[in-house]
Curated annotation (Swiss-Prot):
One of its GO terms (biological process) is tetrahydrobiopterin biosynthetic process. GO terms for cellular component: cytoplasm. This is GTP cyclohydrolase 1. Pfam families: GTP_cyclohydroI. The keyword Metal-binding applies. Toroid-shaped homodecamer, composed of two pentamers of five dimers. InterPro entries: GTP-CH-I_C/QueF (IPR043133), GTP-CH-I_N (IPR043134), GTP_CycHdrlase_I (IPR001474), GTP_CycHdrlase_I_CS (IPR018234), GTP_CycHdrlase_I_dom (IPR020602). NCBIfam families: folE, PRK09347.1-2, PRK09347.1-3. Keywords: GTP-binding, Hydrolase, Metal-binding, Nucleotide-binding, One-carbon metabolism, Zinc. One of its GO terms (molecular function) is GTP cyclohydrolase I activity.
Amino acid sequence: MENFFNQFFENIGEDKNREGLKNTPKRVQELWNFLYKGYKEDPKVALKSAYFQGVCDEMIVAQHIEFYSTCEHHLLPFFGNISLGYIPKEKIIGISAIAKLIEIYSKRLQIQERLTTQIAETFDEIIEPRGVIVICEAKHLCMSMQGVQKQNAIIKTSALKGLFKKDPKTRAEFMQLLKS
């Protein structure tokens, strides 16, 4: 890591021995270990240990779960919130497990589209609901800081499975719950 940063500092014309930079490689390594800890965790294990047999057959919604991730194209952050709705079949998930699932996938190099899809697919595979929907809204610093430089753009992505994909009324109910 130190060699990487020595080369980086040299390439941008910075003095690697400057007081403020002396411990930067170590600090960045610690930060990266935290930001990308999702590679060391299995999202399926997180869900498998957090569900229980349920009696609810109505829609359950977890709304505005904050996240941040890193764009794999420019290594800049993107951040926002994710809302997940599902209609149980037999399993109900602990609400904190939804946040954990989002955290595991977001703490990896990502693109928003894949993040949204991975959350929906893993949830669908492990919980086996009658339907699941994931809506992700995010701001991308790669879009704000370089290129088109649009600071207020919000990107929205969705992934739908089961009843949410097949039934427009189910989708509409979810969207109405998000508004209320």
